[in-house]
Amino acid sequence: MAAKDVKFGRDARERILRGVDILADAVKVTLGPKGRNVVIDKSFGAPRITKDGVSVAKEIELKDKFENMGAQMLREVASKANDAAGDGTTTATVLAQAIVREGMTAVAAGMNPMDLKRGIDIAVGKVVENLKARSTPVAGSSEIAQVGIISANGDTEVGQKIAEAMEKVGKEGVITVEEAKGLEFELDVVEGMQFDRGYLSPYFITNPEKMTVELENPYILIHEKKLSSLQAMLPILEAVVQSGRPLLIIAEDIEGEALATLVVNKLRGGLKIAAVKAPGFGDRRKAMLGDIATLTAGEMISEDLGIKLESVTLAMLGQAKKVTIDKDNTTIVDGAGSAEEIKARVEQIRAQIEVTTSDYDREKLQERLAKLAGGVAVIKVGGATEVEVKERKDRVDDALHATRAAVEEGIVPGGGTALLYATKALEGLKGANDDQTKGIDIVRRAIQAPIRQIAANAGHDGAVVSGNLLRENDENQGFNAATDTYENLKAAGVIDPTKVVRTALQDAASVSGLLITTEAAISEKPDDKPAMPPMGGGMGGMGGMDF
């Protein structure tokens, strides 16, 4: 086992604080509408230019092991804020640096670290209450667009595209971000439920130009098992033919003879039919077939439920306004399912999301939720160069997470003013002793740091800006760094999601509290052995080999 290097007390805290400062100073230059870019060198390819706080934080690794501990703890703050709200990483980093600095100064002056931490926790709870009380729900797509614009550093097109996508697929819908081939932003929206299974035979195609199957007002047979023979299906097939409507069969698989029979019937014109494989695998397949059944007001034909193919009636089949199938995807538009049943199914999936511990399962459940509740939108981000596309994609991702957070918990005035005005909630608040009261005071000063940094990045004195605002009575009044003016920020569209501001503060306080209460730090000692000498070059005694 390698020898360890152990640092205690002030020495440990000072080393850790140096690491915190290095990471925070690199991240905080990106804060606000006039924040600067950071260039990150890559071991291969072009350098990456970004204004995304968490991307900068993830790249920082320091040589000194103790300084690196501080940097990595602060990186954890940015990552946690990113995971919880998807944005606010730079704000969280600035807050954490401010709390750690003030806290370590207080500890060096002889205060009890545990009481300081208790005071910090009391103050954070009070500020969170204040933020929730002042939060207002998002009203309409113009405010959604505005949140996106602010998060994307004033890029109007980004905010508008996100608002448009949310309008089309609903607030629960899936919105993904991809890189485009061209220069422009594009928005592709798939309405209805889409799953990644195409037609089983090209003979089912009804639109040769687009190479798609289009079924208007079809019945949908949802079968859990394989179909190898159509014998059991004959009664339901005859009923569908008599109804004069098309039929879509969704089954685990349709094998040789059964598929050949369907194709022959389709080609002879007696049966408007198409067949696709069921989406997913194992238990997830069952769940997705259940979703399709709910959406189309059909029943899943499963022997587990005691339903056999021979006894299926038209009433058991699902229905939809239109089904479109290409070689890769099937889209069901406007299923006949009742709103109440779909809502109940959505709530059931939501409950599963709450209890699952697996990120993969959560992602798949959210996909199912979106397919039931709304649809899928893809924002394609274009640009002149690969570097520009990646930088814009970072900003679109941030903006998308921020708008989702705004829809979830509402909005507060932006630009760091929500936290600045929350200092008023801490006035006169006392802890159980002087050290706890000092902890409350640390938070009161720290929550002024974001607005000071935004002002500093815009070329103003942060202390003057925060002082001017604290004299204001209207809490919507703030400093708009984009235009260098004091104005009503809500009216000017400078707004932040409450969830982003709240999680930034809670995550910053959580990690800062741990750093302040650190009394010893242990790291592996560097190896003192000299490096091995390089291998000797050439192969001696091999003369006469000059060709």
Swiss-Prot record:
Top-level taxon of origin: Bacteria
Stated EC number for the protein is: 5.6.1.7
**One MF annotation (Gene Ontology) recorded for this entry:** isomerase activity
Annotated GO CC locations: cytoplasm
Q: Where is the composition biased (Gly residues)?
A: 535-547
Coiled-coil residues: none
Q: Which CDD domains match?
A: GroEL
Q: Where is this protein localized, as stated in its record?
A: Cytoplasm
Its top-level enzyme class, in one word, is isomerase
What PROSITE patterns has UniProt attached to this entry?
CHAPERONINS_CPN60
- Which positions bind ATP? 30-33, 51, 87-91, 415, 480-482, 496
Reactions catalysed, semicolon-separated, are: ATP + H2O + a folded polypeptide = ADP + phosphate + an unfolded polypeptide
Keyword Chaperone in the entry? The reply is: yes
Q: Which UniProt keywords apply?
A: ATP-binding, Chaperone, Cytoplasm, Isomerase, Nucleotide-binding
Q: Where is this region: Disordered?
A: 525-547
Residues spanning the signal sequence: none
User: What is one process in the GO biological process aspect for this record?
Assistant: protein refolding
> Which coarse location class applies to the principal site listed for this UniProt protein?
cytoplasm
Q: Name one Pfam family in it.
A: Cpn60_TCP1
NCBIfam families reported for this sequence: GroEL, PRK00013.1, PRK12849.1, PRK12850.1, PRK12851.1
* Function summary: Together with its co-chaperonin GroES, plays an essential role in assisting protein folding. The GroEL-GroES system forms a nano-cage that allows encapsulation of the non-native substrate proteins and provides a physical environment optimized to promote and accelerate protein folding.
Subunit description: Forms a cylinder of 14 subunits composed of two heptameric rings stacked back-to-back. Interacts with the co-chaperonin GroES.
**Which family does this protein fall into?**
Belongs to the chaperonin (HSP60) family.
Question: This chain belongs to which protein, by name?
Answer: Chaperonin GroEL
The beginning of the lineage is: Bacteria, Pseudomonadati, Pseudomonadota, Alphaproteobacteria, Sphingomonadales
